[in-house]
């Protein structure tokens, strides 16, 4: 493996490199199928101006290539580690580097997932490398495409202005969220498990949305238990609050339904202060779940006595001028029974998104909409022809020549 190092500044590169992976990591077989091997860098800096030097290529007769990243600023942090914005000194390209502490005993599930993903509405992995600290802690660095905004910040922006988000943006963002979910659920078999406005990146010029942060993502296997204490509180599906361990990708659909409601309202629909409080907030809107609905979420709770509360009509939650299609879609996504929630692909053909299929649809500034109909064959595999005809409007069919429509 190539020797790589860290340089404190462009003029004085440190010569100390790490020539090989630690012994325990030889079993990890980490390979980047974009012709980029996971290399190791020595050092751990995210301070502004810090330069990280790594090597890519060198396989299948490919020339080795040195890439240097200069850390610019921290853009996010959490229990996982830190995300910082960096610039590639060779190309001038801005990237995001997510740095996570790596347990040497295990493969990194996020890296494995990211390598499978290739979609216009999912953030892409460019490269990855390892770095070590003085204490010999190992960090995995995921070099990702940089997208400057988040849906969370866009919501805050409109709140500050005391305005409702223009409906065209609500439709655009929600459509792209469900297109990303349809892809990861149907094509990859992965459940994201942490859909929330902070994990939805937005390009403020094109309004293209990209799903990010696959740190909680997992392939759900029928019959295999999963942890229920995942997903951020306001967006947690009720079956997770009930402690279900055999849930499905419908938990992402619930979360995305909560995001849609928040885009329409300007604030979270279910702002619970704790797990139990979260359930109370849901019951206040959906009413007390029936015995049958409880059984669908977690059979262990069917005997539990819940306060009997009537459902609050959806049209009273949203203002009078709210389009009925918007209210209808929210009601189809936020169902207690996971199997009754609209699947991500079915959601894309909902009438709420018909405006996006209009050949004359434009952004408020007159620009074209971002690409919405450039489906790849695997995205629509097994989809009935009449549904495909709805998903790919006539004016966009040249983007999918493989369809033969």
Curated annotation (Swiss-Prot):
This is Shaggy-related protein kinase alpha. GO terms for biological process: hyperosmotic salinity response; meristem structural organization; positive regulation of response to salt stress; response to salt stress. Residues 69-353 form the Protein kinase domain. The active site is at 194 (proton acceptor). Residues 1-24 are annotated as: Disordered. The gene is ASK1. GO terms for molecular function: ATP binding; protein kinase activity; protein serine kinase activity; protein serine/threonine kinase activity. Keywords: Acetylation, ATP-binding, Kinase, Nucleotide-binding, Phosphoprotein, Serine/threonine-protein kinase, Transferase. It catalyses: L-seryl-[protein] + ATP = O-phospho-L-seryl-[protein] + ADP + H(+); L-threonyl-[protein] + ATP = O-phospho-L-threonyl-[protein] + ADP + H(+). Gene3D superfamilies: Phosphorylase Kinase, domain 1, Transferase(Phosphotransferase) domain 1. Disulfide bonds: none annotated. Autophosphorylated mainly on threonine and serine residues.
């Amino acid at each position: 493996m190539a020797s790589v190092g860290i340089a404190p500044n462009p003029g004085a590169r440190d010569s100390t490199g790490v020539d090989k992976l630690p012994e325990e990591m030889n079993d990890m077989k980490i390979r980047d199928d974009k012709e980029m091997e996971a290399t190791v860098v020595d050092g751990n800096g995210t301070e502004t101006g810090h330069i990280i030097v790594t090597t890519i290529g060198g396989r299948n007769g490919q020339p080795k290539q040195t890439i240097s990243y200069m850390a610019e600023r921290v853009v996010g942090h959490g229990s996982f580690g830190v995300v910082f914005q960096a610039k590639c000194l060779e190309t001038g390209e801005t990237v995001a580097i997510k740095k996570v502490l790596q347990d040497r005993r295990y493969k990194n599930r996020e890296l494995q997932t990211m390598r499978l993903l290739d979609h216009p509405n999912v953030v892409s992995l460019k490269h990855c490398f390892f770095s070590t600290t003085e204490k010999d802690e190992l960090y995995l660095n995921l070099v990702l495409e940089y997208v400057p905004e988040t849906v969370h910040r866009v919501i805050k922006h409109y709140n500050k202005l005391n305005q409702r988000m223009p409906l065209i943006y609500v439709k655009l963002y929600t459509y792209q969220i469900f297109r990303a979910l349809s892809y990861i659920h149907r094509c990859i078999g992965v459940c994201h498990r942490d859909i929330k406005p902070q994990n939805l990146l937005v390009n403020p010029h094109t309004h293209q949305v990209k799903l990010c942060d696959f740190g909680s993502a997992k392939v759900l296997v029928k019959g295999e238990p999963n942890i229920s204490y995942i997903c951020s509180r306001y967006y947690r599906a009720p079956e997770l609050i009930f402690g279900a361990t055999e849930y499905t990708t419908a938990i992402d659909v619930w979360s995305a339904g909560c995001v849609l409601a928040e885009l329409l309202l300007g604030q979270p629909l279910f702002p619970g202060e704790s797990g139990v409080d979260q359930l109370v907030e849901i019951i206040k809107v959906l009413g007390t779940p029936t015995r049958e609905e409880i059984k669908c979420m977690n059979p262990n709770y069917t005997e539990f006595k819940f306060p009997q509360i009537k459902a609050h009509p959806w049209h009273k939650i949203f203002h009078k001028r709210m389009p009925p299609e918007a209210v209808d879609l929210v009601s189809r996504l936020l169902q207690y029974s996971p199997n009754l929630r609209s699947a991500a692909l079915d959601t894309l053909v909902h009438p709420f998104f018909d405006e996006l299929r209009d050949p004359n649809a434009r952004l408020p500034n007159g620009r074209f909409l971002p690409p919405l109909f450039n489906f790849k064959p695997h995205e629509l595999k097994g989809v009935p022809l009449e549904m495909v005809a709805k998903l790919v409007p006539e004016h966009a069919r040249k983007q999918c020549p493989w369809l033969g429509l």
